[in-house]
Amino acid sequence: MKRTTIKLLFGLALLAGWLGGAAAQDVEASDMVRGGLQVIQLVDQGKTGELWDGAAPAAKKRVARADFMAQISKLRGPLGMPLQRTWVAINRQVVADSDADLAGQYVSVEYETRFTNTAANRASMRELVSFHMDRDGIWRFSGYVLR
């Protein structure tokens, strides 16, 4: 557990180093794609609790740690492991909200993924990983959606 936490913190520190302090329009797409893959690899490995621990305050306000872990497990478990994953889009958005933790810049990276247990491995799913630039100027994980 301690080793996993250290790896997660190191990965998040690398992500923060790549992305920290930059305005959304200045963020390199390749950095966001790499950061998104780091997040998804934690999901692949079942390390969603550790992922939630390093998430943006806005994400933690929306869902409790146990609920986040249960929701991801319920969605991903039946699909099996990924066979192929390709990023397909990066979206940027500025959100105005009276809650300072929710307001601000968001970047989402969308991946097309085929899993071992999906209709003869032919059907692909979309995974969306979102990041929020927190008030301290550091990009942090803020969401994972599977559709």
Where are these regions (language model features)?
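Bacterial N-terminal signal peptides
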Residues: 9-18
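Second-shell loop/turn segments in exported
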Residues: 25-26, 37-41, 54-62, 116-118
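Short solvent-exposed beta->alpha transition segments
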Residues: 33-34, 49-108
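Short, low-complexity N-terminal intrinsically disordered segments enriched in polar/charged residues
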Residues: 2-3, 19-45
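Bacterial N-terminal signal peptides that target proteins for export
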Residues: 1-10
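Exposed beta-sheet edge and beta->alpha loop/turn motif
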Residues: 90-147
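Internal amphipathic alpha-helical segments of the cytochrome P450 catalytic fold
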Residues: 48-49, 138
